[in-house]
């Protein structure tokens, strides 16, 4: 799942590059039919990937949690999807260490669950846990966490 209006173009380029088994889906396309498709794909053993540290640039639901000692916005989407799809969550990271890339696949949550009245609280808790774990990896390799926008910028920073 991606936060880009260019998902269709990326899908075409992936196909041209021989990666036709990958499909990028724009998060704004999510509807009940696509959610059903995602559920069926997960049931077949396929994987769903979404960046847990990227919020939409304009609007979108996010949660502010502590990240490396500062409040930061993280998307609700990964946790909402995991709960709705009743699927486990893994962390996937890549670090360059001693000149070699190390791909890390780490089980993170067997299930994200909530009751109707505590959904927001549970999503905030999972987001905080994720931010804590991501922060540990960022401290381990601070030059390898890439953001191309002011991550900690808040709406308050826009005021004169």
Regions found by a protein language model. Name each.
Residues 1-30:
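Membrane-interfacial amphipathic helices and adjacent loop/beta segments
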Residues 16, 20, 32-160:
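Non-catalytic C-terminal accessory region of glycerolipid acyltransferases
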